[in-house]
């Protein structure tokens, strides 16, 4: 991974995305800058410091902490953070944070709370991967991100379907395969 501070790219990039709960505990974190956040211990220490600064000051939504530009947004029991270089354009960091929050809000049906987020963690991870690839901001349109991460009707898990729906789907598929084998 490239050093984000000494090797600038022409692409907009971030150092990490973090979601903490109301107690400052990590719910989800994805760091892209291995020089600033090399170990889990360093990450946790940064998160603790970040939470202590942001939980007291709910009026601001941006701060500079340890040479990292931090944009954040709080909701019922969650804090969403986008971390960037001090040279990074704050408007793009804000667009990334807004995209993350809006996409999560759509997926969770506006129920942006810790329990709902944990229940949909797989989709939330997909959202983060669609927004950012190895630190490079790829998308800032929440609707586009949600569309790309939405499950297709054929990909719905068995737990989300009734037994009759699974049986009907299986029979329909078997029937189509049988028809094609007869036509050959």
UniProtKB/Swiss-Prot annotation:
Alphabetic keyword roster: Cytoplasm, Cytoplasmic vesicle, ER-Golgi transport, Golgi apparatus, Membrane, Protein transport, Transport
Membrane topology according to the record: Peripheral membrane protein
GO cellular component: COPI vesicle coat; Golgi membrane
Coiled-coil parts of chain: none
Subcellular location per the Swiss-Prot or TrEMBL entry: Cytoplasm; Golgi apparatus membrane; Cytoplasmic vesicle, COPI-coated vesicle membrane
Parts of the chain that traverse the membrane: none
Listed GO biological process terms: embryo development ending in birth or egg hatching; intra-Golgi vesicle-mediated transport; intracellular protein transport; oocyte development; retrograde vesicle-mediated transport, Golgi to endoplasmic reticulum
InterPro entries: AP_mu_sigma_su, Clathrin_sm-chain_CS, Coatomer_zeta, Longin-like_dom_sf
SUPFAM superfamilies registered for this protein in UniProt: SNARE-like
Subunit record text: Oligomeric complex that consists of at least the alpha, beta, beta', gamma, delta, epsilon and zeta subunits.
Family: Belongs to the adaptor complexes small subunit family.
Function: The coatomer is a cytosolic protein complex that binds to dilysine motifs and reversibly associates with Golgi non-clathrin-coated vesicles, which further mediate biosynthetic protein transport from the ER, via the Golgi up to the trans Golgi network. Coatomer complex is required for budding from Golgi membranes, and is essential for the retrograde Golgi-to-ER transport of dilysine-tagged proteins. The zeta subunit may be involved in regulating the coat assembly and, hence, the rate of biosynthetic protein transport due to its association-dissociation properties with the coatomer complex.
Name used for this protein in its record: Probable coatomer subunit zeta
Organism annotation: Caenorhabditis elegans
Lineage: Eukaryota, Metazoa, Ecdysozoa, Nematoda, Chromadorea
Gene this chain is encoded by: copz-1
């Amino acid at each position: 991974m490239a050093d984000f501070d000494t090797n600038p790219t022409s692409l907009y990039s971030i150092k990490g995305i973090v979601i903490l709960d109301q107690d400052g505990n990590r719910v989800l974190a994805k760091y892209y800058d291995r020089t600033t956040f090399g170990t889990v211990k360093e990450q946790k220490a940064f998160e603790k410091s970040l939470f202590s600064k942001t939980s007291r000051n709910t009026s601001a939504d941006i701060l500079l902490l340890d040479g990292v530009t931090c944009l954040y947004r709080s909701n019922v029991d969650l804090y969403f953070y986008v971390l960037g270089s001090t040279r990074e354009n704050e408007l793009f960091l804000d667009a990334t944070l807004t995209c993350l929050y809006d996409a999560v809000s759509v997926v969770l049906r506006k129920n942006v709370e810790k329990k709902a987020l944990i229940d949909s963690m797989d989709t939330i991870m997909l959202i983060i991967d669609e927004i950012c690839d190895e630190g490079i901001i790829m998308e800032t349109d929440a609707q586009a991100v949600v569309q790309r991460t939405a499950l297709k009707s054929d990909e719905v898990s068995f737990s989300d379907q009734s037994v009759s729906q699974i049986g009907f789907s299986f029979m329909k598929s078997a029937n189509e395969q049988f028809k094609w084998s007869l036509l050959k």
